[in-house]
Amino acid sequence: EISCSLVGSEMCIRDRFEFIPWILGTCANLEEAKTALIHMNLTNTPYSEQFPLAQLHWIIADQSGAITVEAMEDGMHIYENNVGVLTNNPPFNIQMFLLNQYMNLSPKQPENLFAKDIDLDQYSRGMGAIGLPGDLSSSSRFAKVAFTKLHSVSGDSENESVNQFFHILGSVDQQRGCCDVNGKYEITLYTSCCNTQKGIYYYTTYDNHQISAVDMTKEDLNTKNLICYEVITGEHIQMQN
């Protein structure tokens, strides 16, 4: 059982692998999480000897905003996250600093600011974002998904919003074979989002792009049992003839 009493200035000590279950089981919203984190410290206890400690990055969000929490060698760091995205290293404050490189990018077509005496043409759509990185490094994926998210336009319905979410994260998908690390390939195993008001969890997997969903309100949320669903794998193709 994961529990912690926050009384006065008493510190709450948690193992890193308990952090997310503790936050979700203790805090109802982002403001409560911020308050709880003031009194919190994370230990260096590994989850298993097979999984050594690493620098960890978490994003905690609700409709009011988001924060980033990072467990680093020099302790725990908490940042306001105004872009609402997160990737791995470098640390979040460096990721945000690197966005300065892209302040000239725009979803609109560019003006000729190179030289007024040279006739330059807009030979393609999307030239306002030339320079937006497309490689698979964490810092490049951070910049690209931040740009995509902050400029994306969604419809009003839930289905349209869910659809747009998967398009946003699809902009930084990792395809098998494009990131080779000693003969092993980094891929996007799954993509997911949640309607926190309705309790509906949506996901896709690398091998199944059809959006699957679990409605958590259809389960007994007060049970002490762990409820599991088999991940739907294998591409589901809708034949039209």
Feature locations, PLM:
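N-terminal short leaders/motifs
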Residues: 10-23, 140-151
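Short, glycine/acidic-rich beta->alpha junctions
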Residues: 15-16, 41, 52, 184
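Proteins synthesized as precursors that undergo proteolytic processing into mature forms
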Residues: 16-45, 158-165
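Single conserved hydrophobic/aromatic residue that forms the stacking wall/gate
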Residues: 1-13
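Short, surface-exposed charged micro-motifs
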Residues: 3, 68, 191-193
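C-terminus-biased signal that marks the final domain/tail of proteins
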Residues: 45-47, 53-54, 62-63, 85-241
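Short helix/loop capping segments that flank catalytic or ligand/cofactor-binding pockets
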Residues: 68-71, 77-81, 88-89, 203
